[in-house]
Curated annotation (Swiss-Prot):
It comes from Macaca fascicularis (Crab-eating macaque). Substrate binds at S138, Q148. Gene3D superfamilies: NAD(P)-binding Rossmann-like Domain (3.40.50.720). This is 15-hydroxyprostaglandin dehydrogenase [NAD(+)]. InterPro entries: NAD(P)-bd_dom_sf, Sc_DH/Rdtase_CS, SDR_fam. It is found in: Cytoplasm.
Length: 266
C-alpha cells in the first residue's frame, strides 16, 4: 500500500511510539487521526505536528479505548471527518500488574474491538476499499516474563489474535491485511514507570530483575519502531506477519512452521 493520500487512525498517538507512528505516516503523506485518552498531551501533540505539517492533515480525538462506546464514536468521527479509513494502528497500551483487569481491557480487549471496528469500515464485503491493521504487541508476547504475567498474557493474545484474524480476513476476501509488531524495551513513558509499585504490584520485590533485563536487551528509540510500521504497511505481501525489533538484530520477523490446515479464501 502506498501511504500517500491515505487516512490513518492511531491510538495512543499523543506520546512515545504512537506519536512516532503519527509523524512517520504524515511524512509519507497520510492524514492521521490522533486518538488518545490524555487531553493535554493530545492537544500538545497536534499543535507540535501542525508546525511541521498542514493542520488539516491531523485530527485529535480524546478517547478511552477501554470504553466501547467511545471507541465506536471515535471511528465514526474519523470517517465522517476524513471520508474514509485505510490504516488502523492499535497502539494504546499499559503495563500494570497491580490493576491487571485494566491491563487486559486496554492491551487486548480494546485491540480486538478496534480491529473489528476497523474491519467494519475497511472490508470490501462491507463496501470498503480494503486497508491494513497493525496491532502493537511486544517481545513479551513471544516469551515469558516472570514479573509481568498479565502483561505477557495480553501481548501473547495480540499475537495469536492478529495471526488468526489475518487468516480470517484473507478467507473472507476482505482486502484488509493484519500484522503485529513486537519490539523490545522502547524509550517511552511506560518504560520509565515500569518498576514502580503502582505498576508491578506483588512483583515489586523483583524490580531489579526488570532492570537486569533492560540492561541485557537494551533500549530502542520510537523512530525505529515507526520504520517497522511503514515496512508492514507498504509491503502488500505481509499478512499475519509478526515483526520483531531488537537492539541486536533490528527489524526482523518471527518464524513459524506452516500450519497443517490452511483455510482457503472463497
Amino acid at each position: 500500500m502506498h501511504v500517500n493520500g491515505k487516512v490513518a487512525l492511531v491510538t495512543g498517538a499523543a506520546q512515545g511510539i504512537g506519536r512516532a507512528f503519527a509523524e512517520a505516516l504524515l511524512l509519507k503523506g497520510a492524514k492521521v487521526a490522533l486518538v488518545d485518552w490524555n487531553l493535554e498531551a493530545g492537544v500538545q501533540c497536534k499543535a507540535a505536528l501542525d508546525e511541521k505539517f498542514e493542520p488539516q492533515k491531523t485530527l485529535f480525538i480524546q478517547c478511552d479505548v477501554a470504553d466501547q462506546q467511545q471507541l465506536r464514536d471515535t471511528f465514526r468521527k474519523v470517517v465522517d471527518h476524513f471520508g474514509r479509513l485505510d490504516i488502523l494502528v492499535n497502539n494504546a497500551g499499559v503495563n500494570n500488574e497491580k490493576n491487571w483487569e485494566k491491563t487486559l481491557q486496554i492491551n487486548l480487549v480494546s485491540v480486538i474491538s478496534g480491529t473489528y471496528l476497523g474491519l467494519d469500515y475497511m472490508s470490501k464485503q462491507n463496501g470498503g476499499e480494503g486497508g491494513i491493521i497493525i496491532n502493537m504487541s511486544s517481545l513479551a508476547g513471544l516469551m515469558p516474563v516472570a514479573q509481568q504475567p498479565v502483561y505477557c498474557a495480553s501481548k501473547h493474545g495480540i499475537v495469536g489474535f492478529t495471526r488468526s484474524a489475518a487468516l480470517a480476513a484473507n478467507l473472507m476476501n476482505s482486502g484488509v491485511r493484519l500484522n503485529a509488531i513486537c519490539p523490545g524495551f522502547v524509550n517511552t513513558a511506560i518504560l520509565e514507570s515500569i518498576e514502580k509499585e503502582e505498576n508491578m504490584g506483588q512483583y515489586i520485590e523483583y524490580k531489579d530483575h526488570i532492570k537486569d533485563m533492560i540492561k541485557y536487551y537494551g533500549i530502542l528509540d520510537p523512530p525505529l519502531i515507526a520504520n517497522g510500521l511503514i515496512t508492514l504497511i507498504e509491503d502488500d505481501a505481509l499478512n499475519g506477519a509478526i515483526m520483531k525489533i531488537t537492539t541486536s538484530k533490528g527489524i526482523h520477523f518471527q518464524d513459524y512452521d506452516a500450519t497443517p490446515f490452511q483455510a482457503k479464501s472463497q
